[in-house]
């Protein structure tokens, strides 16, 4: 009956998914599972449940739901116009990444670039990284990451070299306080937009310097950062955090809105093995094969059968927050041993406490393999 009605109305669809109309949770569960952005129904209870689950929901106007205050449309054309407008209202994104550091950055960059229907990617800025054991200086790391970004974009047939900017050549904790292309671009983009999301998957140096140079951006940006460890852990000697602790302090001491995805015991749950990657991505594209190759031997940790693909967590959080559980806390202080000290200050920040590994990887494989 539904198919016949859709065909008679000339309504095009990719998939037809039927749910139990008597189960008010059924549509919300399916929307979350399939990462559906917008839902429409004429049932107030179904719409209300979808709204409770963070799904953008429209009520089709009927005589029996006219007393509800849920946003509604009266005609299918109105819904079409709403969806068209919604799709054009993409979130402005800056990705701050140390792309050549490990294999997870390449996965995250690919994942982001495969979701341009959701995001307006304003810039990709190169975060600093270095390794004494590999004799890689920050300056060399900048070049390696910059070239890696361009290589991945070329595989995806994207010419966005004008959106890639080199960043800091040292860390604030080493006395570095210079502006650079990345810092200047972060400020420029933040000031021109009403809202910009900065996705940090490396040391937070560029972002901290931008806040320090132009405090006006504080109320115009939101930071989503992978760094540190879970609340209550003995220390934060995690790579992104320990590279530039002074930069973390600058961000914490500002009033900027920030969500932190901790590594130990939270994002570490994204561990996966090489066989699962091969089963889902092998031979889907030249880029997918490269990602598998980098996963197997990232040139730093040596050959490994399984790893955590850390950085995809930040992209996934922006795609669907329903895959995560969070906790809002008073912004902690950072002790000398890098551990967090609880406070009662009024500044609140958000910590991710749990994630749905399976849903994240299901979406990553689907998008990356397209």
PLM regions: where:
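Short His-Asn-centered micro-motif
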Residues: 1, 19-20, 40-43, 98, ...
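Anion (oxyanion) recognition and catalysis
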Residues: 7, 51, 252
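Asp-based, Mg2+/Mn2+-dependent phosphohydrolase catalytic module
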Residues: 24-33, 43-89
């Amino acid at each position: 009956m539904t198919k016949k009605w859709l065909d008679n109305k000339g309504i095009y669809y990719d998939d037809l998914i039927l749910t139990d109309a008597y189960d008010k949770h059924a549509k919300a569960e399916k929307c979350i599972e399939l990462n559906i952005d917008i839902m429409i129904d004429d049932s107030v209870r179904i719409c209300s449940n979808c709204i409770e689950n963070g799904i953008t929901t429209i009520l089709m106007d009927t005589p029996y739901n006219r007393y509800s205050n849920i946003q509604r449309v009266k005609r299918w054309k109105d819904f079409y116009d709403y969806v068209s407008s919604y799709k054009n209202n993409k979130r402005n994104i800056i990705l701050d990444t140390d792309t050549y550091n490990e294999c997870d950055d390449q996965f995250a960059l690919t994942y982001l670039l495969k979701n341009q229907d959701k995001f307006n990617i304003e810039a990709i800025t190169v975060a600093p990284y270095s390794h004494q054991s590999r004799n890689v200086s920050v300056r060399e790391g900048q070049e390696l990451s910059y070239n890696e970004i361009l290589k991945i974009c070329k595989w995806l047939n994207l010419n966005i070299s004008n959106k890639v900017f080199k960043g800091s050549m040292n860390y604030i904790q080493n006395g570095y306080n210079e502006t650079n292309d990345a810092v200047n671009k972060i400020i420029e983009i933040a000031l021109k937009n009403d809202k910009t999301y900065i996705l940090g998957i490396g040391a937070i140096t560029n972002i901290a310097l931008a806040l320090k140079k132009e405090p006006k951006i504080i109320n115009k940006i939101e930071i989503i950062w992978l760094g540190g460890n879970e609340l209550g852990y003995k220390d934060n000697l995690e790579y992104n955090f320990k590279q530039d602790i002074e930069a973390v302090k600058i961000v914490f001491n500002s009033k900027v809105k920030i969500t932190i995805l901790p590594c130990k015991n939270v994002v570490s749950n994204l561990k996966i093995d090489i066989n699962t990657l091969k089963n889902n991505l092998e031979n889907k594209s030249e880029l997918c094969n490269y990602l598998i190759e980098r996963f197997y031997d990232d040139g730093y940790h040596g050959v490994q059968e399984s790893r955590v693909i850390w950085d995809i967590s930040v992209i996934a959080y922006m795609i669907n927050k329903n895959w995560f559980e969070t906790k809002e806390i008073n912004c902690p202080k950072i002790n000398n041993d890098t551990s967090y000290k609880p406070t009662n200050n009024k500044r609140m920040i958000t910590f991710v406490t749990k994630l749905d590994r399976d849903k994240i990887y299901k979406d990553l494989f689907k998008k990356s393999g397209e």
